[in-house]
Swiss-Prot record:
Protein name as catalogued: Large ribosomal subunit protein bL33A
Name of the gene encoding the protein in the UniProt record: rpmG1
Top-level taxon in the UniProt lineage: Bacteria
SS bond partners: none
GO CC list: cytoplasm; ribonucleoprotein complex; ribosome
Biological-process GO terms, alphabetical: translation
PROSITE patterns xrefs: RIBOSOMAL_L33 (PS00582)
Keywords: Ribonucleoprotein, Ribosomal protein
GO molecular function, one term: structural constituent of ribosome
Classification via InterPro entries: Ribosomal_bL33, Ribosomal_bL33_CS, Ribosomal_bL33_sf, Ribosomal_zn-bd
Pfam families found in the cross-reference section: Ribosomal_L33 (PF00471)
Family membership: Belongs to the bacterial ribosomal protein bL33 family.
Organism for this UniProt entry: Ligilactobacillus salivarius (strain UCC118) (Lactobacillus salivarius)
């Protein structure tokens, strides 16, 4: 079952990315390194509700 999630930057707390994940394969919250347009660098982004 795939669900849509929002990724939030851990430094500036801006929600910039929408993606989907499979809850069966990834039951925990996802953490990805993505580019943050506000900080102009690659930062850690965490899944939000």
């Amino acid at each position: 079952m795939r669900v849509n999630i929002t990724l939030e930057c851990t430094e500036c707390h801006e929600q910039t990315y929408l993606t989907s994940k499979n809850k069966r394969n990834n039951p925990d919250r996802i953490e990805l390194k993505k580019y943050c347009p506000r900080d102009h660098k690659v930062t850690l982004h965490r899944e939000t509700k």
